Design a protein with these regions (language model features):
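Phosphate/pyrophosphate-binding loop motifs in nucleotide- or prenyl diphosphate-using proteins
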Residues: 1-170
Length: 170
């Protein structure tokens, strides 16, 4: 029996909570496309749960919505190029689906940190990488469900302008 205070048990709990959060977001949505996209994410989380519980390494690469892991990384780091908007500055104007995805993205990041702590210097570091890409994929998905007029963004390369857009100069 595993000691309940180990980082592995903490990781299992976080993965379980992550799966529950996805199911909750699906349950409260009326949007079939949103529900389906979240199911794709949930399937990866379930695979990670099974791999962790059975001491198997998640070795395979994955793709979501026709994007490879490298494409997910590129799009999440260059949203203006791919989505015509800068990095998202969360705000209640983003509406329910996007706000839910933003919350989910942050929860995936928390699970990633827990996984990295649980599996320092081991073959299981792939799990950390998959979680990193999964949070990036959810970030990309957020753009799909943002209202067209949403204009709250982090602006890394331009001066702050007083145009009614909420921007933060970084």
């Amino acid at each position: 029996m595993t000691d309940k205070s180990t980082t592995r048990i903490a990781l299992r709990g976080k993965l379980d909570s992550l799966n529950a959060q996805i199911v909750f977001l699906q349950a409260v949505s009326q949007n079939p496309e949103y529900i389906s996209d979240l199911e794709d994410v949930r399937q990866i989380v379930r695979t990670l749960q099974m791999c962790e519980a059975s001491d198997e390494v998640f070795e395979e690469s994955f793709s979501l919505w026709g994007m490879s892991e490298d494409e997910i990384h590129s799009r999440s780091h260059n949203p203006a190029k791919f989505f015509g908007k800068g990095h998202i500055l969360p705000h209640h104007d983003m509406q329910k689906e996007s706000a839910g995805l933003n919350l989910l993205r942050t929860q995936i990041r928390e699970v990633e940190l827990c996984a990295c702590s649980a599996f320092e210097e081991s073959d299981y570091l792939r799990l950390c990488h998959v979680l990193n890409r999964l949070s990036s994929a959810v970030y990309i998905l957020t753009y799909k469900f943002l209202p067209e007029e949403y204009n709250h963004q982090l602006n890394f390369h331009s001066e702050r302008r007083n145009t009614g857009n909420e921007q933060i100069q970084v």
